[in-house]
């Protein structure tokens, strides 16, 4: 079994391309089902954030898995596959596993060490698990990636003094206005996590008036209440736009929230007063043409790079330590993955032993005549103990040999000596195989 990945991120594609391939939370289940139906796909997870869209596929052949990934991404994008391919990267098993671990640890983020991505990795896995598109290999891989991400944050200072995208947006506004945010009016569009963080950072920086607008007015009211702001209905957005000096927008909408003509009317209503628009949504919330208007400065998520350089050197030192953790956790996963071929033989051996045990217990109980329930349980327990003890050493030694040349010899010997009928499909999600240090996957 192999794991492959394909996708694009902030390093390979600008936001104008990334937004073409972004998946909203509610769109993930049907997308996962479509991907699972691709030829050669045994399991799949889709990770879609503001900085990346990646698909991870468990497959029996790497070439088939990568082909399925590219076909799916091509059909899911508004661009032709030929145009999209220049922005895509494809990763085979070794690179895909290490890449996912680095993503979970925040090492592949635009903001080195940022912590939001770990929650996004966990959510992507949860959605795929609930949709039923994961398998044993992906379950183990994702759980190990999340564990690795937590280890990195616990054992290093990778997230010390780091900044979030929301914080970077506020810092950009502070720089543009030369640290003079006092008395400014800021309109925040959206009431999700990033918008909430932005609103709180704004208050911390001295902004006196924060307007909050959201598709759900109740959520806008709730956020406004926590920061002493004012809630604005989304359909009344244009009425309040002329009051704003800064607009920060981050919604999950699949279409523009602010169009050029709306911004033009707001600017006309306040001649000579500049308007700063910061769009940190993917897909973008603000029509790019709005940035061409006189007096308007429009920034998108890709423009935040200059802000995230703060405190980078300290986090780079932590990143080097984190790479060691990633290497160790990835190697543990590769060992587990490399041992999977022995599992069908172990299952077949246990099943044959269990069948023999059950038959002999029934025969013994019939010969002994009337037995109490307690006596039957004692006989069954004794037979189970004998079987487990007889098989224990063989199974332990087979697992230990799985990563050596002897492993295949042991498998063939057991299958021939015990005349096992082996199902070569992989074990189910609950089958655990321990291969090192007592860690169980």
UniProtKB/Swiss-Prot annotation:
Pathway: Porphyrin-containing compound metabolism; protoporphyrin-IX biosynthesis; 5-aminolevulinate from L-glutamyl-tRNA(Glu): step 1/2
Annotated site, Important for activity, chain positions: 99
GO molecular function, one term: glutamyl-tRNA reductase activity
EC number: 1.2.1.70
Active-site residues, Swiss-Prot/TrEMBL: 50
CDD domains, per the entry: NAD_bind_Glutamyl_tRNA_reduct
Catalytic activity: (S)-4-amino-5-oxopentanoate + tRNA(Glu) + NADP(+) = L-glutamyl-tRNA(Glu) + NADPH + H(+)
UniProt key word NADP: yes
Single GO BP term: protoporphyrinogen IX biosynthetic process from glutamate
SUPFAM superfamilies documented for this protein: Glutamyl tRNA-reductase catalytic, N-terminal domain, Glutamyl tRNA-reductase dimerization domain, NAD(P)-binding Rossmann-fold domains
Protein origin, superkingdom: Bacteria
InterPro entries cross-referenced by the UniProt entry: 4pyrrol_synth_GluRdtase (IPR000343), 4pyrrol_synth_GluRdtase_dimer (IPR015896), 4pyrrol_synth_GluRdtase_N (IPR015895), GluRdtase_dimer_dom_sf (IPR036453), GluRdtase_N_sf (IPR036343), NAD(P)-bd_dom_sf (IPR036291), Shikm_DH/Glu-tRNA_Rdtase (IPR006151)
Notes concerning its domains: Possesses an unusual extended V-shaped dimeric structure with each monomer consisting of three distinct domains arranged along a curved 'spinal' alpha-helix. The N-terminal catalytic domain specifically recognizes the glutamate moiety of the substrate. The second domain is the NADPH-binding domain, and the third C-terminal domain is responsible for dimerization.
Record's subunit section: Homodimer.
Family (UniProt): Belongs to the glutamyl-tRNA reductase family.
Record's protein name: Glutamyl-tRNA reductase
Organism of derivation: Moorella thermoacetica (strain ATCC 39073 / JCM 9320)
């Amino acid at each position: 079994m192999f794991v492959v990945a394909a996708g694009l991120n902030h390093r390979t594609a600008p936001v104008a391309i990334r937004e073409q391939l972004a998946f909203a939370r509610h769109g993930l289940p049907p997308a996962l089902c479509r991907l699972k139906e691709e030829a050669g796909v045994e399991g799949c997870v889709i990770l879609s954030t503001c900085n990346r869209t990646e698909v991870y596929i468990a497959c029996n052949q790497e070439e088939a898995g990568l082909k399925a990934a590219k076909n799916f991404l091509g059909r899911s994008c508004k661009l032709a596959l030929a145009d999209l391919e220049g922005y895509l990267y494809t990763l085979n098993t070794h690179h895909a596993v290490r890449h996912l671990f680095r993503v979970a640890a925040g090492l592949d983020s635009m903001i080195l060490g940022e912590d939001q991505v770990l929650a996004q990795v966990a959510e992507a896995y949860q959605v795929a698990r609930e949709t039923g598109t994961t398998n044993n290999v992906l379950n183990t891989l994702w759980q190990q990636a999340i564990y690795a991400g937590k280890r990195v944050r616990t054992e290093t200072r990778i997230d010390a003094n780091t900044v979030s995208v929301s914080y970077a947006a506020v810092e950009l506004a502070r720089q543009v206005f030369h640290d003079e945010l006092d008395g400014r009016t800021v309109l925040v569009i959206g009431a999700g996590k990033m918008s909430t963080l932005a609103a709180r950072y704004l208050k911390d920086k001295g902004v006196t008036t924060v307007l909050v607008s959201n598709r759900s007015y109740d959520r806008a009211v709730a956020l406004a209440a926590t920061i002493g702001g004012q809630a604005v209905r989304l359909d009344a957005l244009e009425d309040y736009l002329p009051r704003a000096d800064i607009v920060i927008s981050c919604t999950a909408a699949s279409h523009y929230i602010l169009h050029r003509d709306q911004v033009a009317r707001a600017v006309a209503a306040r001649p000579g007063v500049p308007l700063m628009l910061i769009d940190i949504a993917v897909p973008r919330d603000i029509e790019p043409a709005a940035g061409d208007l006189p007096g308007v400065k429009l920034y998108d998520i890709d423009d935040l790079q200059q802000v995230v350089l703060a405190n980078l050197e300290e986090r780079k030192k932590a990143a080097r330590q984190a790479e060691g953790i990633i290497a160790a956790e990835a190697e543990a996963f590769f060992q587990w993955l490399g041992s999977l071929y022995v599992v069908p033989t172990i299952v077949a051996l246990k099943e044959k032993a269990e069948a023999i045990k059950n038959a002999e217990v029934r025969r013994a109980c019939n010969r002994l005549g009337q037995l109490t329930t307690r006596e039957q349980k004692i006989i069954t327990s004794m037979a189970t103990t004998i079987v487990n003890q007889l098989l224990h050493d063989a199974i332990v030694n087979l697992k230990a040999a799985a990563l050596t040349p002897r492993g295949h010899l042991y498998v063939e010997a057991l299958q021939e000596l015990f005349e096992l009928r082996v199902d070569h499909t992989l074990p189910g999600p609950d089958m655990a195989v321990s291969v090192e240090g007592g860690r169980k996957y």
